[in-house]
Amino acid sequence: INCKGKKVLVIGGGDTGSDCVGTANRHGAACVTQIEIMPQPPVGQNPATPWPMYPQVLKTSSSHEEGCIRRWNLASNRFIGEKNNLIGVEVEEVEWVPSPDGGRPQMRQTGKKEIIEADLVFLAMGFLRPEQEGLIKELRLATDNRDNIAVDNAGYTANSNLFACGDAVSGASLVVKAMASGRNVARSIDR
């Protein structure tokens, strides 16, 4: 994938998203925008995440310092194409409202939509676990105690025709580990 001269959109505000921002800049992207569905975290200490919880604070990496537009509270709704080429992504502003039962805040779409021009998009989201609705549920895949897809050493799922790898199996980790997992499963598929 070559980012030279492209309008790059990175969907996801974590470490993997930061890696995508840096790589796009080093490839010579025309512009790089990074969006995150969550609110912008505070700088410094966050009273909402005291020790020993994972600290939710604003992180500005060396990749961000190389240059990008960073935006928060945006959900991606759809990709927009023209003549088989991506030209943008429709995004919508979201709000986070307290849960009636006191649990995690709930996302509410505001109806405020816009198009972010992009001809290359990197998907770098999903820190907690794979989405259970959709493929996992429809294919009746078994999951482990952390809701990751359960596999054997070769990457087979409970459905013997399907393999899984990367963060969907291990949980959030480094990109290089996901790549290694993908290569190992590819070898299993090739056998």
Residue map of PLM features:
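A conserved FAD-binding loop/helix module that cradles the flavin
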Residues: 17-22, 27, 159, 165-190
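FAD-site-proximal beta/loop scaffold in flavoenzymes
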Residues: 1-5, 98-172
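Cofactor-binding loop segments of dinucleotide-utilizing enzymes, especially the Rossmann-like FAD-
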Residues: 13, 36-40, 167
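A conserved short coil-to-beta-strand element within the FAD-binding core of flavoproteins
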Residues: 73-85, 93-97
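Active-site rim loops that border cofactor/substrate pockets in soluble metabolic enzymes
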Residues: 56-58, 64, 89-110
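Beta1/beta-strand and adjacent pyrophosphate-binding region of the FAD-binding site
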Residues: 3-14
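Rossmann-like dinucleotide-binding cores of NAD(P)H-dependent redox enzymes
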Residues: 21-78
